[in-house]
C-alpha cells in the first residue's frame, strides 16, 4: 500500500525554526521516503503569475535549499545525541556503543554536506547492530528521495529548460 502525505513546503532557515520549522521536520521524520516536488514552470495555466517564495523560479536552488535544511536538521540531531551516546557507551552496553559509533561515523558526512543515506551507499555503516541504531535515530537524509518536476501543461514531455535542469 502506498500512502502519500502532503507536507507543507520548507523554507530556508527551517532548521532554525523559520516557517513551519520544527513542525515540518517532525512531520517529515515520520515518513518512509520523500518525494520532493520542484516547481519547473514560470506561470500558471492562462499566464497567471504565481509568486515564488524566493522571488524567482530556480528548481536547482530549491532542491539545494531543502536538502541543506534537511542536512542541518540531521546535524543538529547528532550534536544533541552524540554526547549522551558517548556517556552511555562508557557502560559498554552494546547498543549504546553501536549508537555512539553510528553518530561518530555519520557526523563528518553531514559536515561535508552528504546525506546519511550515503553512509549506507558507501558502506560506512555495515554492522547489523549499527544499522539497527541508525534506523532508530530517525535521520531525515537517510530516507530515499525522489524529485518530482511540477511542469506546466506545455511541458508534459519534459523538454523545457527548467525541467532539464532538474
Name every feature range the model reports, one short phrase each:
Residues 37, 47-48, 91, 116:
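A generic "cationic amphipathic patch" detector
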Residues 3, 31-39, 59-85, 102-118, ...:
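Conserved beta-strand/loop subsegment of P-loop NTPase cores
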Residues 1-33, 41-67, 122-137, 162-163:
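Switch II of P-loop NTPase G domains
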Residues 1-19, 27, 67-71, 75-76, ...:
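Conserved ASCE/P-loop NTPase catalytic core
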Residues 84-166:
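C-terminal-of-GTPase-core extension/linker across diverse P-loop GTPases
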Residues 52-53, 74, 156:
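A short, ordered amphipathic alpha-helix with a cationic face
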Amino acid at each position: 500500500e502506498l500512502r502519500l502525505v502532503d507536507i507543507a513546503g520548507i523554507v530556508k532557515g527551517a532548521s532554525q525554526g523559520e516557517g513551519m520549522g520544527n513542525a515540518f521536520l517532525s512531520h517529515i521524520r515520520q515518513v518512509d521516503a520523500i518525494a520532493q516536488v520542484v516547481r519547473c514552470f514560470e506561470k500558471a495555466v492562462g499566464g497567471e503569475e504565481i509568486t515564488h517564495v524566493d522571488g524567482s523560479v530556480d528548481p536547482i536552488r530549491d532542491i539545494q535549499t531543502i536538502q541543506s535544511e534537511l542536512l542541518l536538521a540531521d546535524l543538529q540531531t547528532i550534536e544533541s545525541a552524540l554526547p549522551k551516546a558517548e556517556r552511555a557507551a562508557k557502560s559498554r552496553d552494546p547498543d549504546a556503543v553501536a549508537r555512539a559509533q553510528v553518530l561518530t561515523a555519520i557526523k563528518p558526512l553531514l559536515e561535508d554536506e552528504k546525506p546519511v543515506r550515503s553512509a549506507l551507499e558507501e558502506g560506512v555503516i555495515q554492522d547489523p547492530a549499527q544499522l539497527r541504531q541508525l534506523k532508530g535515530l530517525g535521520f531525515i537524509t537517510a530516507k530515499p528521495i525522489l524529485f518530482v518536476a511540477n511542469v506546466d501543461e506545455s511541458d508534459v514531455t519534459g523538454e523545457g529548460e527548467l525541467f532539464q535542469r532538474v
